[in-house]
Amino acid sequence: VYGLWYGNNYGSIITYYALTRVLESLNYTYAMIRNPLGREIDIDALNRSHPLKFARDRYEVTPLLPINRLSELNNNFSAFVLGSDQMWNYNLSRPYGQSYFFDFVADDKVKIAYATSFGKDKYIGPEDEKIRTDRNLHRFDGISVRDDFSQRICKDEFGISAELLSDPVFLCPVEKYNELIAEASDFKVEGDYIFAYILDPNEKIGASIQKIAEETQKKVIVVFNESGDKESFKERLKISSELVSYELVPTVNEWLY
C-alpha cells in the first residue's frame, strides 16, 4: 500500500487504517511502503510522533528505499494499491516523480488506485509531466477516485473511465473505530461539546468557531495537525471566547474519540 499513511494529518492516518482493515477483512496480507523521501527513524523521533507510533503498532512496513530503488519491491509483492487522499495533486506528488503513478511497478503486477484524488478541479501539472502521467495511468488495472472532479479529469485529460468510490473510512466497520476509541480510556471530555479539526487556521474560521460557540453555548475543542507552531495557529484564529479550548497534540485514538 503506497500513500500518506505516515503524515501528521489525522484524517489521512484514519483513512489508511480503514483501508488496511478492509484489506484484512478480504484476507489479503499487505505492507505499507515507507516514504521514499523519508529517513531512518530513531527511537526519540518515534516516541514523539503519533502517526509513527500508531503505524508501529498496527502495520507491516517495508524497508526504507529511495525512489530509484522502489522497483525492488516487485520482488516481494504481487499487487500494489495506491491509497486515497490527494496522491495525484501535482503540488504534492512532484517531489516523488511518477512513483505515485506506479512507474516503478512491473507490468506483470496488479496496480490499483483506490479513491485517489487530484486535489484540484483541474489538472495542474506541466505538459511533459502530463505525458508521463498519461502513460502510467493506462498501466493501471483499476482506477477509482473519491470526487467527481477527479473522475472528470481522468476522463477529459487522460481518456480513462474511473469509478467514483467512497473514501475507505466509510468502508471500515464502525467496530474497528470503537476499538481505537477504547484505547483512549484515559481521555474524557465532560458534557456536550463541538469538535473543530482545523488544517489551515485563519481569522475567518476563528470567527465562525466563536459564533457557533456563543450561539449554542457549547464548549468547542479545537485540534490542529500534530506538526507546526500551535501558538501561531491559535493567534491566526483570533478567538476570544472562553467557551473555546485547545487539545494541542492528541493521540490518534483521542482525536477519533
Describe these PLM feature segments.
Residues A31-I33, V81, I112-Y114, S144, ...:
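Hydrophobic/aromatic beta-strand patches that form the interior of the parallel beta-sheet core
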